[in-house]
């Protein structure tokens, strides 16, 4: 079935409290999607953010971001007063200020925690359900706060290396903070589950994003060092990244520790199966970031200042996904297969049967044989994007692309004026044979270059994009609905209205 989606992270939702929340504006956006004939909402990882504010560099592969917790729902539960949060200065409505959030959110959540009944049966059941990861995460965060946010590698050696007696003493000493971080996760997932249920009941599927790697300063590396290539002091032997290319002359040095794939193979990929089971339980579909890293991954010696020196090493390939399928059954997954894709990577993707990705912004650099041009799609089993969170907005792209790309795009799209290219690029994405077409919310809102979500290989100024409620008006909803009607991407229950709406487009054109 042909479908459409919009990519917008929770952080970008309209909100009066510094960042998007799992509250009223999230439900209103779901209503907007339904009204627009859109059946998919894609978000970025829900994980807590750390240094650099990236959801792809988190303290945990499982935890939810405390900043997204809706204060209004806590007030409704009698845990907060309205004045506890409503009168504060949350900064600009146009940009997320993560430093301000760090300073302001936790005292408010701590006040709600003090009023919370920790004997609540739902909370007790939540802790039991998530006992595989929650206790270690809560202790990790309690210790991090006790050490003024320092990385675990800077803690006392007996804590960094997880001496059993020292951990037990720390758990007793910081019991209130440990329980605080457990309660935060209970609130987060209670609100997330409620939102997901609402979306699903209204015909909207949620696509979540799973990074392939975890951060070095994460509870996984601290509590399960055997999963990674570390030395006896638990320092990385090598780290992840990408080799140099035309876009990045020195490559991309991500710095994530690499997996000990021999260990994972010996355990039957148990950790990965658990991680995939969790991801597919909180999302309807999971996008796996840097999928090519499962076939082969770029290894950079630890301590190197750039990614210029490194080597490709073999990953688990299809063995991991066969093990996951045997344990969990068929999973709703698609692969981020962008970048340096070899025949071996394509063979792995084909063997798994997962959809790959097509990005329209990449379509105009190599002439008529470019694989990202819709005419060259080989299968409907793919997801077509106007652009991803790592790309420029369409309006930004048309003023930043090379003259050669713009010239070809004009000829291909039969457009004379550069300013008309974004609309045509959106249309060919929707008109492609891809089963699912997704556009960045910025592209529907016709946002300029400074609305870009992330610029790879830059450390600051990313992940800050926000929207306002007035942007999601009836005019935009009608435009998106008509686009879906014209290109047969309406949900099945909306098909009967499609012919009428297509005629409206013809009349308006």
Label each region the model flagged.
Residues 181, 186-214:
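Conserved, well-ordered alpha-helix/loop/beta-strand core segments that scaffold catalytic motifs
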